Amino acid sequence: MLNRRSFLQSAGLAAGFGLRAAAQTTRPQSPDTAVPASDVQVPRTKFAGAEISRLVVGCNPFYGFSHFNRILGTVMREYYTPERVCEVLHQCARFGINAYNYVGLGRAGQDLARFQAEGGRMHLIVQGMGGPETIVPLKPLAVYHHGEMTDQAFDQGRMETVKDWCKRCRDAGLFVGVGSHRPNILEYVEDRGWDVDFYAGCVYNRTRPAAEWKRVLNGEALEMPQEVYLRSDPPRMYEFMRRTPKPCFAFKVLAAGRIEAEGADAAFRQAFSSIKPIDGVFVGMFPRVSDEVRENAERVHRILTSA
């Protein structure tokens, strides 16, 4: 996985890096029946009536959500032209990654339409940021209430609005879940028996209230408190995911790119050894310096097939 600090130092040296190959144009029948183009295929699990890869491609790098700083976010947006977004999605499909953690912001809808017009197919697991009327036309496999919006609702005592959103999605015929960055919020939903099908949990607690940070750090003030990643956090989210019988997706398992090389192997191994066989992970790909799609697909394949 790319070390984003090192990348910022070397970006100028790699400015001429180009796209390796054009997108595939053969139209497969569905994400489940696409003919693999690589010997390495990410293992799958059943979810929402389909078979999906346990590694799901994330969308954050596509649209500059670096969770690092404005500079890296800008570099990501400049790199990820519509052509490159589609190429990465096609490459994911060649490695058996057939699910996409989609968010309907900016030009994401146009990029998805282009990918599909080129013959690409992905099961969409949508980050829900609008009403079901904006989600149903996408024909998603599933949708979940966006994690930061869930956390804000919890802090403001408005969890009934999240429950109502889930009900409206259910009434619209959607397979529905709840996302959060805090295991205690997902426990809140689980303990109250909400009518939801699955959970999406950030393994690092990025949305700690200021008062909690003061307790954790003995009153120290932080720069960018929502981008601090504590090593003690992942086991807490993984514990919740093991305990619930519902499918779960873990995200930010690489601490938004802060974990690399051997550390990435360990992070993926920790994730898959800590969650259930019906669970998966969302991981964004930024192949600006190295072939992260291949690296991550091979890593997950190796971990899951040798278990």
Question: What residue spans do the PLM features occupy?
Answer:
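N-terminal secretory signal peptides and thylakoid transit peptides that target proteins
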Residues: 1-14
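C-terminal segment of N-terminal export signals and the immediately downstream linker at the start
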Residues: 21-56
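Conserved, mostly hydrophobic/aromatic
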Residues: 57, 176, 248
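Acidic (Asp/Glu)-rich catalytic clusters
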Residues: 112-119, 132-139, 240-243, 271-276
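Catalytic alpha/beta core domains of metabolic enzymes, predominantly
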Residues: 179-270, 285-289
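C-terminal helical cap(s) of enzyme catalytic domains, especially alpha/beta-barrels
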Residues: 290-307
